[in-house]
Amino acid sequence: MVPLSEYATVDEDATLSEALDVLEKAQEQFDKTRYRHRAILVCEKKTGKVIGKISQLDVIRSLEPKYDLFMEEKAFPQTGMSHFGFSPKFMKNILDQYQLWYEPLHDICGKAGKQNVKDVMHKPTAGEYVKEDANLGEAVHQLIMGHHQSLLVTKKEDIVGILRLTDVFKEICIDRRKANQPSAGQK
């Protein structure tokens, strides 16, 4: 778990451009022995409480607002359209029909940077929170079942950190290595 105090955060009134600056700075300053941040937590201005998060995918998706026309979560509450496994031909048809990514990337990025993070952020669902005292198996189950890249860790009602899939994977690799080492009595 990465403590909340060590994670990239922005106020809800920040622009997407400001949020990306914070993420870049956090990546530069983060301990080089660990994985870099891949998301930004959005905090309520008055209370400082986490109200959302912005992943790298959220940022990229926000560059092309036309995705909202057919990937709206209201139409597909669990996953949007992203998990249906469409054919390459169908995907290309959508790209052309909605004229996605037709403008130069430089122009798209310039417009998107002015967006407010409240309009881009993902509001975590109940399945994206895990209690601080939950065992690793429970957290792994939530990550797998929800296809989540991270979970917000809570202590009572407060968010105290973020448990990232990359950290869980690293721990699994360490434990696998230990499990495959011969014990002291074996040779």
Predicted regions: what is each one?
Residues 1-6, 56-128, 140, 144, ...:
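Tandem CBS (Bateman) regulatory domains
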Residues 1-4, 14, 21, 53-56, ...:
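Non-catalytic interaction/Regulatory regions outside core domains
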Residues 8-11, 51, 128, 160:
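Short amphipathic alpha-helical molecular recognition features
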Residues 10-37, 63-64, 129-147, 172, ...:
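The conserved cystathionine-beta-synthase
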Residues 23, 34-57, 143-146, 151-166:
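A glycine-centered beta-loop-beta connector
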Residues 26-28, 45, 103-106, 116, ...:
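Residue-level detector of functional hotspots within protein domains
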